[in-house]
A protein has these predicted regions:
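Conserved glycine-rich cofactor-binding loop
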Residues: 17-18
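Substrate-binding pocket helix/loop in short-chain dehydrogenase/reductase
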Residues: 94-95, 102-107, 211
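C-terminal substrate-recognition "lid" of short-chain dehydrogenase/reductases
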Residues: 115, 217-248, 253
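Active-site helix of classical SDR
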Residues: 118, 154, 162
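Alpha-helical segment proximal to the catalytic Tyr-Lys
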Residues: 123, 167-168, 239
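Residue(s) in the substrate-gating loop at a strand-loop-helix junction
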Residues: 138
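Short, small/polar-rich loop/turn modules that mediate ligand/substrate recognition or access, typified
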Residues: 170, 175, 241-243
Length: 254
């Protein structure tokens, strides 16, 4: 394959069945990587696997430590070079209306999920010629937003974990980075638009425009733009880039 810097590398993408995760999977495959998709939704995983052809797929809830351990136990026969932590969920509510269940879900999936997968993957990544961990955080991991305190707390945690792991593994071939998108044109953002429209009694077009106005470019970020940033950090040539939280937000966060 021409221009395939990830030829022979194997990459795990969590939440790889749709949205940013699927865009990342496509991009890594185009660069030559062999894919393993993890996700909770078997139907989405199946559709992604059929589209991508050669990809493996494992049903896995990243928020469940046992589930993650079982999934990664299937990967020990061959080297692993890349882990992309993309699986995530978002719920919105004022803090006083945030239930314990919502708080726990936000931390369990968005933060503990990254911890579980990184812990399981690191022995394999260290043993490979090069290793990459890239976590899809959010601009909510860099600044605060109203009505998503639990989500912000989790994503700030992802950025902190990224920086700590980058230092912990600085003397190995493993780099650890985060990509922090603004609002991305994905099914999850469409759910956010619907919730915003309901909460503000606006139609969906007006609600979408509210999100677009947060971006100085006055648009939603494309999933492929996030995927390109992730893919760049996964390259063997990106060895000197570690501990970074890179905003992909049209200038919303600088």
């Amino acid at each position: 394959m021409a221009d395939a810097p990830l030829q022979g590398a194997r990459a795990v993408v969590t939440g790889g069945g749709s949205g940013i995760g699927l865009a990342v999977a496509r991009r890594l495959q185009a660069l030559g990587a062999e894919l393993v998709l993890l996700g909770r939704d078997a139907a989405k995983l199946g559709r992604a696997q059929r589209e991508l052809g050669a990809a493996d797929a494992i049903a896995c809830d990243v928020g469940d430590a046992g589930d993650v351990a079982r999934a990664f136990a299937k990967l020990h026969e061959r080297p692993l070079h890349v882990l992309v932590n993309n699986a995530g969920v978002a719920r919105s509510a004022k803090l006083v209306d945030t239930t314990d269940q919502v708080w726990d879900e936000m931390l369990r999936v968005n933060l503990s999920g990254v911890f579980h997968c990184a812990r399981a993957a690191l022995p394999l990544l260290v043993a490979a010629p090069f290793g990459r961990i890239v976590s899809v955080a959010s601009t909510a991991g860099l600044i605060g937003y109203p009505h998503v305190a639990a989500y912000c707390a989790a994503k700030h945690g992802v950025v902190g974990l990224t920086r700590a792991l980058a230092l912990e593994y600085a003397r190995t071939s493993v780099t650890v980075n985060a990509v922090c998108p603004g609002y991305v044109d994905t099914p999850m953002t469409q759910e956010t638009i619907g919730a915003l429209a309901h909460a503000t009694r606006r139609d969906r077009t007006e609600a979408r425009a509210m999100l677009e106005r947060r971006n100085p470019q006055r648009r939603l970020v494309a999933a492929d733009e996030v995927a390109d940033a992730v893919a760049w950090l996964c390259l063997p040539a990106s060895q000197s880039i570690t501990g970074q939280a890179i905003s992909v937000s049209g200038g919303e966060v600088m």
